[in-house]
Amino acid sequence: MTKSGEVVHQALQAFMPQEGGVYDSIVSNPPYFHNSLKNPDERRAQARHTDALPINVLFAHARRLLTPTGTLSIIVPTDNAELYLSEAYLHGFSLCRRCDVRTTPRKMPRRSLLAFALTHGHMVERQEAVLQAADGSRTPWYAALTADFYIR
């Protein structure tokens, strides 16, 4: 049986794959607050602010760790998405998928799910998703996405 996934609790900057291995996919919920008021809890501040993992460092290490056909998938605030798109381009990545997520149909998107590849020339798959219907219930998309996390 081959290994299909691995979770490592370590700073990306210090991570060295075993046997010079590279990965087909990297998924990250990177810190995304820039120059904003920090939480007094050091762990929360590290998880939320880019001081510990600047955007350029994320892309540089993703490039180092991905196969030539691998993808980097991240979730970021929609209002910061352009910053990530620009940085991705500077590191040789191109956007292959984008899903902008709204909490309700009437609100603007709050989060963007972005997938980048090192290969170029493909069409960008775009989608918009909504978490809650107007009545407050989970949308079918969100219910299907999170079904495995709920007790039945």
Question: Residue ranges of each PLM-predicted region?
Answer:
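Short amphipathic alpha-helix with an adjacent loop that forms part of the alpha/beta core around
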Residues: 14-21
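Conserved Class I SAM-dependent methyltransferase catalytic core
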Residues: 52-109, 113-114
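Mobile active-site "lid"/loop adjacent to the S-adenosyl-L-methionine
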Residues: 21, 30-57, 61
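SAM/dcSAM-binding transferase cores
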Residues: 106-152
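Conserved acidic residues
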Residues: 24
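Structured loop/turn residues at beta-strand edges in well-structured enzyme cores
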Residues: 3, 21, 93
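Conserved SAM-binding strand-loop segment of SAM-dependent methyltransferases
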Residues: 1-14
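A conserved beta-strand element that flanks and buttresses the S-adenosyl-L-methionine
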Residues: 27
